[in-house]
Amino acid sequence: MIHFVVHEEGDGVGVVVVEGVKAGQEIVGWIMEDDKEIRVVAKNDIPIGHKVALRDYRPGDTVLKYGVDIGKVVAPIEKGEHAHVQNIKTKRW
């Protein structure tokens, strides 16, 4: 079962596409560009439509999704953590 999708190999986050992702659960992702699967252990409950980090991030790092810069990290994020407004901010303003 696919739990999250990743558009490009270089993306640092995947988008959760099922409900009920729980902390401690091994989740399976599909990298669309390469048609391959990856696995990550969720460190938090992650709602459908939200992002899961695919690598560790430090404040100031840039996050890529769909091959596009979606923002700057403002709080440390570990691989498998919920990546959202609490730890990523847009660079637009």
Give each language-model segment a name.
Residues I2-W93:
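N-terminal small-residue-enriched
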